[in-house]
């Protein structure tokens, strides 16, 4: 295990070129200059407060770490870094990893199974990612592992477990829940019609409300053109929660 393979001051010393290079990915190129400056400031603070822990031969340099920090901070650009309280480490495996998963069925029986995971997060504890999928998160494709796990963290600020309803005013909860479930049903209808592989939205969104919120958060930031026109009411709720409208950056 390698902790801090580079020093935080390296980013400060090389800031002029490093942040320009770190921002030069499809996910971030459409941010305004003002948004980029504020995102960099958040990312610098993120790297001061969190540890990136490279596991099983993963090598992190300043550029990789800066990009990871920028993506972590994109969802909380208008919320503030305090929304990422509750964890101090980001563990990074080289590829998806195997974990022992337990769940309780409808009659109370507990089952266990070894499953492959791309990432994990808990209310208190580290976020676990893998480098293979982190690299794919640089694109504006609708897939973003970092944003997915950040969304779970934001979701869990509203309770002990992720529910798909983040910390929003109580008066908005019923409408949020209605629109989120409508989106899940719509996605499931498409899956039933064309199959999981041909669906235009990741089929994982149809599994439960928490995953729907996390998956659609990926699309919100990395493929707004697929989210906004299909679920306009839910899109507006996401805009209100995140205090951003990524579709405006495409114009």
Curated annotation (Swiss-Prot):
<comment type="subunit">
    <text>Interacts with Mlc.</text>
</comment>
<dbReference type="GO" id="GO:0004177">
    <property type="term" value="F:aminopeptidase activity"/>
</dbReference>
<dbReference type="GO" id="GO:0006508">
    <property type="term" value="P:proteolysis"/>
</dbReference>
<feature type="binding site">
    <location>
        <position position="152"/>
    </location>
    <ligand>
        <name>Zn(2+)</name>
    </ligand>
</feature>
<dbReference type="GO" id="GO:0008270">
    <property type="term" value="F:zinc ion binding"/>
</dbReference>
<keyword id="KW-0378">Hydrolase</keyword>
<dbReference type="InterPro" id="IPR042252">
    <property type="entry name" value="MtfA_N"/>
</dbReference>
<keyword id="KW-0963">Cytoplasm</keyword>
<comment type="similarity">
    <text>Belongs to the MtfA family.</text>
</comment>
<feature type="binding site">
    <location>
        <position position="211"/>
    </location>
    <ligand>
        <name>Zn(2+)</name>
    </ligand>
</feature>
<keyword id="KW-0482">Metalloprotease</keyword>
<dbReference type="GO" id="GO:0005829">
    <property type="term" value="C:cytosol"/>
</dbReference>
<feature type="binding site">
    <location>
        <position position="148"/>
    </location>
    <ligand>
        <name>Zn(2+)</name>
    </ligand>
</feature>
<dbReference type="GO" id="GO:0008237">
    <property type="term" value="F:metallopeptidase activity"/>
</dbReference>
<protein>
    <recommendedName>
        <fullName>Mlc titration factor A</fullName>
        <ecNumber>3.4.11.-</ecNumber>
    </recommendedName>
</protein>
<feature type="binding site">
    <location>
        <position position="111"/>
    </location>
    <ligand>
        <name>Zn(2+)</name>
    </ligand>
</feature>
<keyword id="KW-0645">Protease</keyword>
<dbReference type="InterPro" id="IPR057256">
    <property type="entry name" value="MtfA_enterob"/>
</dbReference>
<comment type="function">
    <text>Shows zinc-dependent metallopeptidase activity.</text>
</comment>
<dbReference type="Pfam" id="PF06167">
    <property type="entry name" value="Peptidase_M90"/>
</dbReference>
<comment type="function">
    <text>Involved in the modulation of the activity of the glucose-phosphotransferase system (glucose-PTS). Interacts with the transcriptional repressor Mlc, preventing its interaction with DNA and leading to the modulation of expression of genes regulated by Mlc, including ptsG, which encodes the PTS system glucose-specific EIICB component.</text>
</comment>
<keyword id="KW-0031">Aminopeptidase</keyword>
<dbReference type="InterPro" id="IPR024079">
    <property type="entry name" value="MetalloPept_cat_dom_sf"/>
</dbReference>
<keyword id="KW-0479">Metal-binding</keyword>
<dbReference type="InterPro" id="IPR010384">
    <property type="entry name" value="MtfA_fam"/>
</dbReference>
<keyword id="KW-0862">Zinc</keyword>
